[in-house]
Amino acid sequence: ACIEKYPNRKLYALTPNFRGVENAVNAGITNISYVISVSESHNKANIRRTHEESLAELQKIMDTFPQADICVSLATVFGCPFEGIPPIQKPVDFAKRVYDMGIRSICLADTIGIADPKQVRETITAMLAALPGCEFQIHIHDTRGMGLVNTLAAIECGITTVQSTLGGLGGCPFAPGASGNTATED
């Protein structure tokens, strides 16, 4: 019933599993953001799956719901509460894996809000060079008050889709101390 109230809005469902996608599609939402952490330890803590299990489930989702517009949201691109800051090549290589599966939209998530503008620029530049046909989005948490400048750095690199939340809501249960997303109103 809610979807009919907002016919000119693009709603999407953020989900880490097949059941979430199934529920979204059954509710009339076909814009899906499927979450996989670049950090395997965070992926196991957050959604209780290995990388291989998450990728296999992504393939099952793609096969079962061809009408779904899937964006893979890569969590912990800029840092992980368990593994620290990854070398830039690690998220680039993971993005290549989902791109090779047929995904053409990837969201780069600063899950715990520790990125800085230099890291954002370097990561996006590397992603754009490695996957020139891919649409990239950005998802920044504002833990250290860097959300706006990191978002600006992403926009300056050519990112045109920014995920944000009203009032900076959000967070991650497996990222103690991490705040919500950059506030839309900012």
List each model region and its residues.
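Short gly/pro/ser/thr-enriched loop/turn and capping motifs at secondary-structure boundaries
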Residues: 39-42, 168-173
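N-terminal active-site wall of soluble small-molecule enzyme domains
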Residues: 1-23, 126
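Alpha/beta enzyme core
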Residues: 18-44, 56-64, 68-69, 77-138, ...
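Core AdoMet radical
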Residues: 9-16, 44-52
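Short acidic/histidine-rich active-site segments
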Residues: 162-167
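Short glycine/serine/threonine-rich phosphate/pyrophosphate-binding segments
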Residues: 145-151, 172-173
